[in-house]
A protein has these predicted regions:
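Conserved beta-strand scaffold positions in the cores of enzyme catalytic domains, especially
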Residues: 74, 87, 154, 222, ...
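Active-site/substrate-binding loop(s) of hydrolase catalytic cores
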Residues: 107-110, 122-255, 259, 263, ...
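Short hydrophobic beta-strand that contains or immediately precedes a catalytic carboxylate
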Residues: 112-115
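Active-site-adjacent mobile loop/cap segments within catalytic or ligand-binding domains
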Residues: 231-242, 271-334
């Protein structure tokens, strides 16, 4: 439809033409680079993630709630096995419509992030917490853009009982990332690696996350962030858009990393994609709600440059990936 036809249609019937949400962001140029003094979470760092409880993550968020009460809010969604599942919302300042009779209001660009649904993947929670810390303390133009224009809704530790015991499953022995519909897999072997529980949504953690998703059906993206035991970072992909996003992000970051770290091999992408099967996972549930979901996996220890699980060089690289992925999403959906 041409612009003239759109205008004619609007004036003939002003309620008939619907134009999709538009977002006007001023985007910086280049690639975001994490600070060189990013703190690691290895056994040799001040914070050893595999020996910590979920509180080490919550402390970072709680500090932000105290420092920025007009922007950061906290909600205790529930308590499981004596441990809280917290939710934090990072809001920007919305423009006010001074006309009381108007129904035109600002629509936020919202991104949801869920981390550590597998308890022994503490690095995802740590990296995401550092992102939000830098989001409010950095004058980097990319951070300023995200801070001003994006609303983030976050569950930092989706499996606190597994986190504090450095194990994959929760205290019921259930893999929370296999406890969803659709495509739930029934199993009579509770000791199996990916045992998803006796039935879909049998676990309170799952029920709370489902409620979280239901309350965020206006989100532009749900990021399901995990850690893998080895290899370069990867995205599990569900469609062509995911592949194109991964190509763009890894192409830019590979150049950056290869320049900064001569240990990396040259002339190749330092990341890859994998197609995801349907296994009753969180991503399956989110996609069933018509939302765009990305599953991102970053390594416990970055090949070539990492020496210990969750050490500083690893965390710096995966923070690069997290932030530049969010930037790419905003840039291509605005």
């Amino acid at each position: 439809m041409t612009i003239d036809k759109i205008c004619l249609s609007y004036y003939n019937n002003p309620r008939k033409v619907v134009i999709a949400d538009m977002f006007f962001f001023r985007m910086p140029i280049g690639v975001y680079s994490s600070p060189k003094d990013v703190p690691g979470g290895s056994v040799n760092d001040a914070t050893s993630l595999i020996q910590s409880t979920e509180q080490v993550i919550y402390d970072i968020y709680d500090d932000l709630v105290e420092l920025y009460p007009n922007n950061v809010t906290k909600q205790v969604m529930g308590e499981v096995f004596g441990k809280k599942i917290n939710r934090y919302t990072f809001s920007n300042f919305a423009i006010e419509n001074k006309s009381p009779s108007s129904d035109l209001a600002y629509k936020p660009f919202k991104i949801c992030i869920i981390t550590s649904i597998h308890g022994y993947e503490q690095g995802a929670a740590w990296t995401t917490a550092l992102f939000f810390k830098y989001l409010y303390s950095s004058d980097n133009p990319y951070m300023a853009m995200l801070r001003r224009h994006v609303v983030f809704d976050v569950i930092p530790v989706a499996n606190p009982s597994g986190f504090s015991k450095n194990k994959r499953k929760n205290d019921n022995g259930v893999d929370l990332n296999r406890n969803y519909e659709p495509d739930f897999i029934y199993s009579d072997d509770p000791k199996s690696w990916g045992y998803g529980g006796p039935q879909p949504a049998s676990e309170l953690e799952t029920q709370l996350i489902m409620r979280f998703i239901e309350e965020n059906l206006d989100a532009k993206l749900v990021l399901d962030y995990h850690n893998i035991d080895k290899g370069y970072p990867l995205f599990y992909v569900y469609g062509q858009k995911d592949v194109q996003l991964a190509q763009s992000v890894f192409a830019s970051l590979s150049d950056k990393w290869q320049y900064e770290y001569p240990e990396f091999p040259k002339d190749q992408l330092l990341g890859y994609v994998r197609s995801n099967g349907k296994k009753g996972m969180l991503c399956d549930y989110v996609a069933s709600k018509g939302l765009w979901v990305l599953t991102m996996e970053t390594p416990w220890c970055m090949p070539e440059i990492g020496k210990e699980q969750y050490d500083a060089p690893t965390i710096r690289c995966v923070l690069d990936l997290l932030v530049n992925t969010l930037i790419a999403v905003v840039e291509n959906l605005r």
